Amino acid sequence: MADVAKGGNRRCVTVTKGCDLALNVADQLGDKVREGKMRLVDLTHTLDHNSPYWPEEASGNPFHTSIATTYQKDGNFTRNLSLPEHSGTHMDAPVHFDPKGESVDRIAVGKLFAPAVVIDVSSAAKSNVDYRVTVKDIEEWVGRYGEIPCGAVVFFRTGWDERWPSQEKYMNADTDGVLHFPGLSVEAAGYLIEHARPVGIGIDTASVDSGRSADCAVHNLTMPAGVYHLENVANLDRLPATGFSVIALPLKLGGGSGAPARVMALIPAEPEIHH
């Protein structure tokens, strides 16, 4: 599948050539937001000591802060911060599972601003916490809304963000320590790479792989294809299925396997009706 994703496709604009264009478009979109022609939706959870974390990566909460300066002593307030790269709403860079992949600081700016869609599987996930998105889910979405734009970020809404910020409910570990939350099937991920060539995949759970996945098959398939992931995304229920754009801005950490990110959706405002 990775070869297909890296191969030519005349329907797709080369993403890496879009950096300057993306910056120009961002300026234009800023004007539209100020003029009320577009609205912004924040897709980012607040990152603090209450944020859920991967239990196997730390014996306790890995988010730590300490006071560096104070108003009383220094005339200003700053903190020192220690946390894993994959904390809160964050981006997984391709190098996370591909030794030859891009680190988070090397992802082209043009890939951070993209068209986006939301595929809603929340009904299925509500009845099955281990639900994995299927090819059928994607095909049904395409049948209803049309083709997924090439070079898009494809979000999957499972409804899991309703459990944030409870560590117990969000990570949902059983008595054996196995996590239980929805994700993608490897077949669905392969379908996306072959048919849509997305720049990114986003989800409102802790991982694009389901919680009980033992081999991270979706990561291992998509990251060699250059696809980044946005995980722990918020507010997907506030987005339309299609017709909007996303801006994903991770910390530019040198060599980073990922980084916390501010993720925002830009949605065209509904036109006013004049009588």
Describe each PLM feature range.
Residues G7-H275:
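Active-/binding-site microenvironments in catalytic and ligand-binding cores
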